[in-house]
């Protein structure tokens, strides 16, 4: 059996845009040819795409860094550099992508073929043909390509199943799945025989079908990490109906009703919304001695918790080993599924607000910040300013002068004066230093 991996931490980096080119038209019989440098190509984006053939996040165990290629540089004759192809990263259905730093959900990928641009490629820098004006018909200005986005991500796989089997270890969940579907889970007479989720397709005699997941057994304290802990509790989140399997024979020496209460407490502690899912109680091992007496006591205790206006969960006595009582259980499960809508896995507050693709600067975006370093130099920072800086070709005087005009237009010079900067003070942006001229 292949190893199951349902969480992974990875980093992605989109490709940088290609640099624009400074070039001039030099052809015989064409006097004063003017600028002819083309734009750089767009950097490749990193795109997640759902592949229904994948079952785990195992591929991300050994490959944790994904980097798209940069765009090509601009060329002469005003030709654009070639844009890089996007990097397609395949993920299984049910993959939730979160920002590793904030923990916020970026996207939830559940449909086969669904795509999401997780890191946008940088745009290509403009060539000098773009900067020609009547006042400067032969500019020696070109932009560097824009850096691609970089992100640290957490991936979580929550299997897609209509029905989830929950219960203590060794209550018969794996046996139930094996007799109602073609799934072949590992079955044994010891705790935690099931250590990975198993998925099977169930078809009732009435013709209804649904996906059922056998999840590793829970024990008291699972929501705090005891036993297999929360490692597989996340897989219950996508289910619409929960089959709560109870060992009515009390073969492990536990009270069946206390088992029922304990497991529900773990579900509630892990995620309060899990108890919103309708449950069917599967009273298993009814072929064992004293099971009938235990079931009668169970029903009495359960009824005491509900008043006449509450909908008490249905109880189905079965024996998975003897294959008794299963048809009525499956029909009831199919009927409950038909009347139960999908549950919203995340609300709006769980999602991280993603910026739109926008190559200007939003009004809300803070243009720059000024701090003072230990060596008394002034340090400029800020997303807008740093983006302008990295796209400026510092090897060409005209580009540097253009950058200086941009800083002045942003109010950097005035802000430095207000902070007390004097003529000759050192100003730093990244690893680039220059003197402040008042």
From Swiss-Prot:
Describe the protein's quaternary organization and the partners it interacts with: Monomer.
Report the record's disulfide bonds.
none
A single Pfam family it belongs to is MMR_HSR1
What is the species of this protein?
Streptococcus uberis (strain ATCC BAA-854 / 0140J)
Its primary localisation, in coarse terms, equals cytoplasm
Provide the residue positions that the database annotates as binding GTP: 167-174, 192-196, 214-217, 284-287, 319-321
Task: Tell me the organism's taxonomic lineage.
Answer: Bacteria, Bacillati, Bacillota, Bacilli, Lactobacillales
Could you tell me what this protein is called? GTPase Obg
Q: What EC number(s) does its UniProt record assign? A: 3.6.5.-
User: Mind listing the UniProt keywords for this protein, alphabetically?
Assistant: Cytoplasm, GTP-binding, Hydrolase, Magnesium, Metal-binding, Nucleotide-binding
């Amino acid at each position: 059996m292949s190893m199951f991996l349902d969480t992974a931490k990875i980093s992605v980096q989109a490709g940088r845009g290609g640099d624009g080119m400074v070039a001039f038209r030099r052809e015989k019989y064409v006097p004063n040819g003017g600028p002819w440098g083309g734009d750089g190509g767009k950097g490749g984006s990193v795109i997640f795409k759902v592949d229904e053939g994948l079952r785990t996040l195992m591929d991300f165990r050994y490959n944790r860094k994904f980097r798209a290629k940069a765009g090509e540089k601009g060329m002469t004759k005003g030709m654009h550099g070639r844009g890089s192809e996007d990097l397609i990263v395949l993920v299984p259905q049910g993959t939730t992508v979160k920002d590793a730093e904030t923990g916020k959900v970026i996207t939830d990928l559940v449909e086969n073929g669904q795509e999401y641009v997780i890191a946008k490629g940088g745009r290509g820098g403009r060539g000098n043909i773009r900067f020609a004006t009547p006042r400067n018909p032969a500019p020696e200005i070109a932009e560097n390509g824009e850096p691609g986005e970089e992100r640290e991500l957490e991936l979580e796989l929550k299997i897609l199943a209509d029905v989830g089997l929950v219960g203590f270890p060794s209550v018969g969940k794996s046996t139930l799945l094996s007799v109602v579907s073609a799934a072949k889970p590992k079955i044994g007479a010891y705790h935690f025989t099931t250590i990975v989720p198993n998925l099977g397709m169930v078809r009732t005699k009435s013709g209804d079908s649904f996906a059922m997941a056998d999840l590793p057994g829970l024990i008291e304290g699972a929501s705090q990490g005891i036993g297999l802990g929360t490692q597989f509790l996340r897989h219950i989140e996508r289910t619409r109906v929960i089959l709560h399997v109870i060992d009515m024979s009390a073969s492990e020496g536990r009270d069946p009703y206390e088992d029922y209460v304990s497991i529900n407490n773990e579900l509630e502690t892990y995620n309060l919304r899990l108890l919103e899912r309708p449950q069917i109680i599967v009273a298993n091992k009814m072929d064992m001695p004293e099971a009938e007496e235990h079931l009668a006591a169970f029903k009495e205790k359960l009824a005491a918790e509900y008043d006449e206006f509450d909908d008490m969960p249905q109880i189905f006595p079965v024996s998975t080993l003897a294959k008794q009582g299963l048809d009525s259980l499956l029909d009831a499960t199919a009927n409950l599924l038909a009347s139960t809508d999908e549950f919203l896995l995340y609300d709006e507050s769980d999602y991280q607000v993603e910026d739109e693709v926008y190559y200007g600067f939003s009004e809300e975006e803070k243009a720059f910040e000024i701090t003072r370093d230990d060596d008394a130099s002034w340090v400029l920072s800020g997303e807008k300013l740093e983006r302008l800086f990295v796209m400026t070709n510092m090897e060409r005087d005209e580009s540097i002068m253009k950058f200086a005009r941009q800083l002045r237009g942003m109010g950097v010079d005035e802000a430095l004066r207000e902070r007390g900067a004097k003529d000759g003070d050192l100003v730093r942006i990244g690893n680039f230093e220059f003197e402040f001229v008042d």
